[in-house]
């Protein structure tokens, strides 16, 4: 027993070692140029992870802004805002405390009352704060279809007359190519270049962005051009060839910053912080920050790039795999291949569970998402246990030792005596032809002293009853036919009724289903076992009657038997 446990434990250790090797070999790593200087600029939205939407909550506080400014001050030379209301007008003064330049934003949409307030506040901020070096009127307003290029050009000219800082608007790069009249109205082009939305792969995104920048330079020579938004999400859905991820985000941003600095390109990274409140943008809108929602830097700015939670997930997968492997230590007569198979299955379930938990731990989820998680685990957890249980059965068939026969069959000869056997067959709405084959098999048994009690229960259809009744009559008086049209207890109830009609001199009762075709020597082989007074029950698995019909039937029979 101890040697068997030791062998099983050794196999679990070996499987766990292979499992660990797989995790190690698949560990994601990346390399990219280091960010040696502070970023040129970061999009800055100082909302905590508890904010559901900036427009639907209280104004952001000075303390929150100051905390977030302190979080980014060591990593950037400037920040860009998108609105000048609801507390965001406090940003320039607080940013000045840490020496940060600010591109002030005025949010423009169809609400003209708010538009007027946004512009009024933004213009005032340019006059009150010397660290404000630009005013961005609107953000993708033309792209959203809320104003035309002509309307935005006129609005920008109006704002330029009210301030001395450069004035522009933020738009997707192709809007600038399509609207030269907009270019003539602004002091510089603030182009949003986000190849993720074009389905560009992470490997090609920087080249694509530089190419777009050069197209803008060629179209508008001499015009100052700023890449006002560039970034890559760390999570979310794939968009054609664009695949988000922690490693991809770090590679893309570090490579882009290196190229931009070398080429003298002005840029702004979107964005400083992950934005859980952007759940309305789908699964990707929340993950563009270089800091997570708790203000932790998501990737190193120099050196190797690694998945931050990968090691934790791998360790959890290994521990779960070992824990799920422990029940197999109770199995007796287990082979090495069987143990390896079971251990591998447990490791697979452990890895799946760890990956599911890692997803929920590293993504921003709503209350509804948590309800989904609880329901999913409630459904999938038992399913995983059922799968492991079925795999245990499969392993015993494929890799286990052949079953041991607990009863030594005696040489087939004439038994010393023939005790009477009463064979009970319960049936419920069964096809008559099938049941007749079962009865014929009983009639062919090499046992002279037997009776057969057939109990049809809850079967009111005469077409199912009368053929069986007639066949029992044909087979003779040894076959007792009972038709109980209404009864409770299902099969157990039918067997109780059969007991009431069992011959008083019957010493042994045999029970078979209505679709069993027993071997002629069934009783001849098993009845002698009851000569041992300690034996009260003998169970003999029955092969499927139709195993020969197809490979599927044969496989089902093999699994059952």
Locate the predicted segments by residue.
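Aromatic-rich peripheral "rim/lid" segments of glycoside hydrolase catalytic domains that contact
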Residues: 33-36, 41, 47-49, 53-57, ...
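Aromatic- and acid-rich polysaccharide-binding/catalytic face
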Residues: 104, 133, 171-209, 232-233
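N-terminal membrane-anchoring/stem segments of glycan-assembly enzymes
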Residues: 327-415
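Cell-envelope/extracellular polymer assembly enzymes that use nucleotide-activated donors
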Residues: 419-422, 451, 456
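Short, acidic, metal-binding catalytic loop of nucleotide-sugar glycosyltransferases
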Residues: 439-449
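A conserved acidic beta->alpha catalytic loop
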Residues: 448, 456-468, 485-488
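Long helical/loop segments within the catalytic core of UDP-sugar-dependent glycosyltransferases
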Residues: 472-502, 506-507, 520-561
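The conserved acidic donor/metal-binding loop of glycosyltransferases
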Residues: 512-517
């Amino acid at each position: 027993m101890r040697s068997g446990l030791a062998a099983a434990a050794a196999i679990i250790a070996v499987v766990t070692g292979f499992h660990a090797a797989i995790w190690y070999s698949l560990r994601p790593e990346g390399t990219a140029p280091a960010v040696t200087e502070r970023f040129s600029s970061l999009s800055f939205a100082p909302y905590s992870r508890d904010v559901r939407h900036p427009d639907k909550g209280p104004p952001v506080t000075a303390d929150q802004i100051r905390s977030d400014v302190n979080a980014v001050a060591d990593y950037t030379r400037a920040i860009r805002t998108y609105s000048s209301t609801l507390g965001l007008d406090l940003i320039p003064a607080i940013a000045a405390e840490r020496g940060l330049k600010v591109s002030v934003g005025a949010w423009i949409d169809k609400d003209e009352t708010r538009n007027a307030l946004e512009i009024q506040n933004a213009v005032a901020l340019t006059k009150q704060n010397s660290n404000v070096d630009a005013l961005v009127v609107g953000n993708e307003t033309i792209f959203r279809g809320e104003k035309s290029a002509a309307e935005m050009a006129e609005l920008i000219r109006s704002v330029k007359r009210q301030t001395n800082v450069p004035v522009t608007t933020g738009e997707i790069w192709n809007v600038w190519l399509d609207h030269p009249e907009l270019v003539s109205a602004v002091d510089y082009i603030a182009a949003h270049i986000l190849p993720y939305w074009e389905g560009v792969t992470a490997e090609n995104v920087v080249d694509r962005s530089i190419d777009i920048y050069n197209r803008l330079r060629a179209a508008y020579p001499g015009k100052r051009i700023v890449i006002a938004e560039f970034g890559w999400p760390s999570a979310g859905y794939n968009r054609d060839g664009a695949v988000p991820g922690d490693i991809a985000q770090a590679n893309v941003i570090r490579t882009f910053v290196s190229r931009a600095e070398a080429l003298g390109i002005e840029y702004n990274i979107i964005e400083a912080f992950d934005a859980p409140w952007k759940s309305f943008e789908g699964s990707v809108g929340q993950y563009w920050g270089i800091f997570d929602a708790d203000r932790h830097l998501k990737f190193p700015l120099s050196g190797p790039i690694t998945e931050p939670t990968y090691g934790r997930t791998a360790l959890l997968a290994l521990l779960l795999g070992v824990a799920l492997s422990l029940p197999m230590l109770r199995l007796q007569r287990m082979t090495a291949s069987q143990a390896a198979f079971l251990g591998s299955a447990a490791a697979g379930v452990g890895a799946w569970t760890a990956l599911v938990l890692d997803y929920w731990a590293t993504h921003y989820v709503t209350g509804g998402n948590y309800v989904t998680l609880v329901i999913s685990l409630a459904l999938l957890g038992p399913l995983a246990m059922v799968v492991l249980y079925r795999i245990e059965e499969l392993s015993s068939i494929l890799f286990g030792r052949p079953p041991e026969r607990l009863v030594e069959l005696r040489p087939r000869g004439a038994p010393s005596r023939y005790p009477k056997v009463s064979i009970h067959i319960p049936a419920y709405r069964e096809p008559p032809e099938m049941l007749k084959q079962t009865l014929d098999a009983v009639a062919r048994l090499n046992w002279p002293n037997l009776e057969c009690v057939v109990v049809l229960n809850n079967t009111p259809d005469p077409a199912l009853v009368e053929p069986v009744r007639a066949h029992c009559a044909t087979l003779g008086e040894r076959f007792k036919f009972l038709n109980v049209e209404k009864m409770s207890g299902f099969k157990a109830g039918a067997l109780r009724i059969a007991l009431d009609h069992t011959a008083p001199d019957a010493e042994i009762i045999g029970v078979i289903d209505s679709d069993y075709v027993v071997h002629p020597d069934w009783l001849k082989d098993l009845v002698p076992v009851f000569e041992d007074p300690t034996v009260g029950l003998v169970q003999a698995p029955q092969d499927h009657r139709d195993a020969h019909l197809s490979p599927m039937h044969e496989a089902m029979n093999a699994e059952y038997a």
